[in-house]
């Protein structure tokens, strides 16, 4: 079958495209711009057109799109004119799963689902189960970063931003939490949002939930948490090299967990994975070995650069909700106790910023200094009065040293540079390219670091 993917550079779309390509289908696609994913897919032999155009047409049997692709996209318009079926990516992905009829491990929720999915996949690979993996991020141990084809069960990250996620029926499901992100896709109805999690839970054989989550804890056949749940934490210690935690089951000391990835939130992610595999009757010794070996996912506290002479670090992170940012900064302050923490944050989506408003500033105030950029729209229409300046204003009212830049190239004028500093480039948009430019400029100048201040402090 000949399949055209509109927006093939997206992390979820590229994984599905890879799956169909490696299963013998004639795959090609288009993207609004060149990305690392489009370059990788092209290297494998998948034709990709940039940008979108009605001329990007090879008489496909099927067109796949995401909700981010508008109905007036020229390729979608042409598909309708040519009477070619158009399917949403998530709908098509469900069809793939139904077609293949394999055992399914799924992870959904607001925060931590990519890392938790990666942990599940890593464990199954360690156990020689040969999983097929669809990941919403890049993990070095997967053959194609965000995808790997196997002969065993399917592991996938299930995006709750679309209500259709409730139509899936995995065998096993971890719900990390449910914080009402993307509520605009549920008619701004918390009840409708909750119902979607309830629906998918009814379709699942085993559900693992966070015992301290208000919306979904009751859905779990088994639960995990800090002090509440089937699996809990008795104590935890952490250093730059590793962290350890003592896990209790039903209130009794059960095992010791060791992780190389930092952050208390990752202890909870691993606890969810332990709860899952223990409930399924797996021998936990190799599961714990796999978790200790786990090295994380790209753009999740990824150290992109370190200058030992000046002790300057540059770290990339995908955090884009207030809770994720709070977890990130708590981790940074734990790992880098003696360094200054500077955050360069790019808000993601107008709808999220409007809904969360002051919550971003409350999370960001954990940093020593903050630079806020304008919003990365993620194909949303701009909303009047909604701007990154909202966060800047809130930070100033909290007494935090903060700066605002409207355009990313202006960052170099305002980033406060000094020795013994950790620069965190944070967001789900294109802020990572600013991180790379910052490192390039720093390496090229490599003079004695001096503090640079902008006029919009």
UniProtKB/Swiss-Prot annotation:
Cleavable signal peptide: none
UniProt main location, coarse: cytoplasm
Regions that span the bilayer: none
Residues annotated to bind ATP: 109-115
One GO process term, biological-process aspect: regulation of cell shape
Function: Cell wall formation.
Name recorded for this polypeptide: UDP-N-acetylmuramate--L-alanine ligase
Organism listed in the record: Thermotoga sp. (strain RQ2)
